[in-house]
Amino acid sequence: MIKQELRDKDTKELHIELLGLFREQFNLRMQAASGQLQQTHLLKKVRNKIARVKTLLTDNTGV
């Protein structure tokens, strides 16, 4: 998902997106722990997406 698409979403949609990313990160971490994860770069990509969504949530709330 590109940055502009994320910026167009409201706070509720960003929270839903964040929840999905946390689930994806959890699944990837479990695969890595069990030795089944072949594409380890996906962990970093998901972590960066989480940071991007959290940044947008902070910008939207103005805290």
Swiss-Prot record:
PANTHER family: 60S RIBOSOMAL PROTEIN L35/50S RIBOSOMAL PROTEIN L29 (PTHR10916), LARGE RIBOSOMAL SUBUNIT PROTEIN UL29C (PTHR10916:SF0)
NCBIfam families noted in UniProt: L29
Record lineage: Bacteria, Pseudomonadati, Pseudomonadota, Gammaproteobacteria, Candidatus Palibaumannia
Gene Ontology cellular component list: cytosolic large ribosomal subunit
Pfam family, one: Ribosomal_L29
GO MF term list: structural constituent of ribosome
Entry annotated with the keyword Ribonucleoprotein: yes
Keyword flag Ribonucleoprotein: yes
Domain of life (superkingdom): Bacteria
Protein name, entry field: Large ribosomal subunit protein uL29
UniProt keywords, alphabetically: Ribonucleoprotein, Ribosomal protein
